Regions:
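A structural signal for leucine-rich repeat
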Residues: 21-23, 43-46, 62-67, 83-87, ...
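N-terminal capping/linker segments that flank leucine-rich repeat
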Residues: 1-26, 31, 213-242
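Concave beta-strand-loop units of leucine-rich repeat
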Residues: 10-14, 27-38, 45-58, 68-79, ...
Length: 242
């Protein structure tokens, strides 16, 4: 099996397919094919450290051969789910893709200390959410989630802004980092984390039909009465902007 030492950089080469010379090659580095016109992952290398696919009309991740990858960036693609994704990824980024609507696929775990970024997609359910390792950042901002059922009880940073959630039931109880929840439709604090070791960023809103909840000082007081927050609280007056 052939081996290449170093990164393979093929971004913005106007490629329509992955060159067949790379089929089954082991790359001791990253593999970058961003911003081409590649539609399938035929001829994909056998293994590499990091995968950069963004900006291609790729409709499926089928073709990736390795079971583990440290970093996978899949922004601005045409995939609708995670079919073909490696079984374990440390950092996965899926952004700016309104066709993406499901976690169905082969992904089983986000590694310890890693991150899951799924942002600006049509994801509406956490069915098939992979196992989340220790101290993982989860960013699910600006999707179409209406429920957090299926989330782990503990994570590192948690960002859930821009979703039509009316409560946080099913969400993490313990956040070891920061928590962001702007532009929400929350009606109450049901499911709100019990412990947040970092900072909190939220939009204020008229929860409980109480106009005082639009007053920052009152909102923060209510928040801290329900949750042990180690850091500071940053509140925005822009709410229910979805």
């Amino acid at each position: 099996m052939k081996k290449f030492i170093g990164d393979v950089e093929l971004y913005e080469y106007h490629l329509r397919e992955i060159p067949d010379i790379l089929n089954d090659v082991v790359i001791d580095g990253g593999f970058n094919i961003c911003d081409n016109n590649i539609k399938t992952l035929n001829n994909f290398p056998a293994d590499c450290y990091a995968i950069y696919l963004s900006g291609n009309p790729i409709t499926s991740l089928v073709g990736i051969k390795q079971k583990y990858v440290s970093f996978l960036e899949a922004n601005r693609l045409k995939i609708s789910n995670l079919d073909g994704c490696p079984e374990e990824v440390k950092i996965l980024i899926v952004q700016n893709n309104q066709r993406f609507n499901s976690l169905q696929g082969s992904l089983k775990k986000i590694s310890n200390g890693g991150a899951l970024y799924i942002r600006y997609t049509s994801l509406s359910s956490l069915d098939r959410l992979p196992v989340i390792g220790n101290r993982v950042t989860i960013d699910l901002s600006y999707n179409k989630l209406t429920s957090l059922i299926g989330m782990p009880k503990k994570c590192h940073n948690f960002r859930i802004s821009g979703n039509p959630l009316t409560n946080l039931l099913g969400g993490p109880e313990h956040i070891t980092g920061n928590f962001d929840c702007y532009e929400h439709k929350l009606q109450n604090f049901d499911g709100f984390p019990r412990i947040i070791e970092g900072n909190v960023g939220m939009s204020i809103g008229g929860m409980f039909n109480n106009p005082l909840m639009k007053v920052k000082s009152y909102f923060e007081k209510e928040l801290r009465s329900r949750c042990k927050i180690y850091g500071y609280v940053s509140l925005s007056e822009h709410y229910e902007q979805i």
